[in-house]
């Protein structure tokens, strides 16, 4: 009997230790899984605003540290392009596109932001983002973020933004980008991944290939969203895309030279960088997306 009682106590002790171990497991520990568990809950949004981030002051820009370095003019691995500083004081931000945006403003007679907004509002350039595999809308150790180009005839409110709650159709022949990430306190972080950012502004039609993209999305309580995407854009591809713009040859040559002057990522064998860093901010509102 005494032996049985001791065995029982040992079993209870082992069980309690096992429970304690289970309770101590941090679901956010380790790398993000390549695939998240499937759940019946997802949330979609349509981008209602998209902005190519400029420098708010010389050397100051939001964005990501894409190469894990804080580079100065003496850093050969970044082709001697100086990193920027986040508005909160964090150094190492990679957003060389911010040096090109003023030239793009010139190409559109100072109406770059308005042209992008107009293309979104008239349904010409709509991108939907879906958050799949949701277990919790504040803290979730694994969610899948899906970018799709969509089409439809959006209703626009008095605030000059697409109204929430509308339904749009996926453009099936367009590429779809997926990435797994984590959500903490309503903020999703994910990457790196490949993202094709469609541009349909004025007469321009092209896709910007963003490599090794990093993503941050804040999901607010009112089902609005704000986000930031950063990554590397191949210089050769961007030059080819800008050649579709209806601008003069002098300005085209200037844009080409500017692109080649801001490359700071993906150095080749000779140390010449083949891509430049970029950061894009966006806002979104809840929507329904037909597959």
Predicted regions and their residues:
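Hydrophobic helical h-region of N-terminal Sec-dependent signal peptides
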Residues: 9-13
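C-terminal motif of bacterial Sec signal peptides marking the signal peptidase cleavage site
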Residues: 15-18
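Bacterial N-terminal signal peptides that target proteins for export
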Residues: 1-8
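Extracytosolic secretory-pathway proteins
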Residues: 22-291
